[in-house]
């Protein structure tokens, strides 16, 4: 979450008149994250989250993930629900941006994920994948393998400002990924951004998944790969195989990975690292002046990518090919 677009109090109060969520008492911007403008609202009826969708979310895509949240919730997946205005719409316009209000989920995201957190997200992700199998809408992933080179082209001329040799490193890896990306693995609805700050816990118990704007239809195991990179590295960027084992075993208790998915997981993890390396690189080089946002370090994902390049197989993640503990 972040704030790119400021909202005046009187403008917000007028916007909220279309909703039955009470009168506005206070609001504040949420600085965490990098993608959209988010505000915590305090009204006479409680707390809500207001999101203004920015650069990477098209207005035409909003119905996909707003309906998805309702679909998942009806099948037992804990996630926020959008508020409907008096016209029966879940999406309005505020400050020239598509705007949505969702209910506030209790819990906090884990700053230092432990084994219980990793197992919790693995289990919840698998349940989400199963619950999404009958979701009728379809949205391709604009940030999958075909979307990476256009991102690289935006930042290539300045990549070496971040680290000498980074441009050639990315170019070579892109060539490899584009030439080897799998196209026969099981697909379905994925979250595509299931980082710790998008998963809430109360203690060690998972209380909900949030932030669905990148949800789409893609390779299910790619979502798992994203989580391996996001949850299983320590602050010094060493890989914690015990956390990976906890995540993968919990996932597979709900949805077993096929042999082909298991064999492809290191490649998918390389691709997942490339995706976030590139979006971070573009964002790092193009933060709007005065934006209440903390750009994330692209070099974190350079190091994660280098690690994944040396993974020989799923055993390096702490599990046997059949899914048993190594």
Swiss-Prot record:
The keyword Nucleotide-binding applies. Pathway: Amino-acid biosynthesis; L-threonine biosynthesis; L-threonine from L-aspartate: step 4/5. Its EC number is 2.7.1.39. It is an enzyme of class 2 (transferase). GO terms for molecular function: ATP binding; homoserine kinase activity. InterPro entries: Aminoglycoside_PTrfase, Homoserine_kinase_II, Kinase-like_dom_sf, Pseudomonas-type_ThrB. Belongs to the pseudomonas-type ThrB family. HAMAP family: Homoser_kinase_2. This is Homoserine kinase. The lineage of its organism: Bacteria, Pseudomonadati, Pseudomonadota, Alphaproteobacteria, Hyphomicrobiales.
């Amino acid at each position: 979450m972040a704030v790119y677009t400021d909202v005046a109090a009187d403008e917000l109060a007028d916007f909220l008149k279309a909703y039955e969520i009470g009168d506005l008492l206070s609001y504040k911007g949420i600085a965490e994250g990098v993608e959209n403008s988010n505000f915590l609202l305090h009204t006479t009826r409680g707390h809500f989250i207001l999101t203004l969708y920015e650069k990477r979310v098209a207005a035409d895509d909003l119905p996909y993930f707003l309906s998805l949240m309702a679909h998942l919730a009806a099948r037992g997946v804990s996630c926020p629900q959008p508020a409907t205005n008096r016209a029966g719409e879940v999406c309005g316009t505020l400050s020239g941006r598509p705007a949505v209000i969702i209910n506030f989920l209790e819990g906090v995201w884990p700053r230092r994920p432990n084994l219980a957190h990793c197992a919790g997200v693995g289990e919840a992700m698998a349940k989400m994948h199963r619950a999404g199998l009958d979701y009728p809408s379809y949205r391709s992933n604009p940030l999958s393998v075909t979307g990476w080179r256009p991102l690289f082209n935006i930042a290539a001329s300045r990549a070496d400002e971040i680290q000498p040799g980074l441009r050639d490193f990315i170019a070579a890896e892109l060539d490899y990924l584009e030439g080897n990306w799998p196209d026969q693995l099981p697909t379905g609805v994925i979250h595509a951004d299931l980082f710790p700050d998008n998963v809430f816990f109360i203690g060690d118990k998972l209380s909900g998944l949030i932030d669905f704007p990148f949800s789409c239809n893609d390779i299910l195991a790619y979502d798992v790969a994203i989580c391996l990179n996001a949850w299983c590295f320590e602050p010094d960027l060493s890989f914690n195989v015990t956390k990976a084992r906890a995540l993968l075993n919990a996932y597979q208790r709900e949805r077993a990975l096929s042999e082909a998915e298991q064999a492809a997981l290191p490649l998918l993890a390389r691709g997942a690292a490339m995706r976030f390396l590139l979006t971070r690189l573009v964002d790092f080089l193009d933060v709007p002046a005065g934006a209440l946002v903390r750009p994330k370090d692209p070099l974190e994902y350079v190091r994660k990518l280098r690690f994944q390049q040396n993974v020989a197989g799923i055993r390096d993640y702490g599990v046997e090919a059949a899914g048993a503990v190594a």
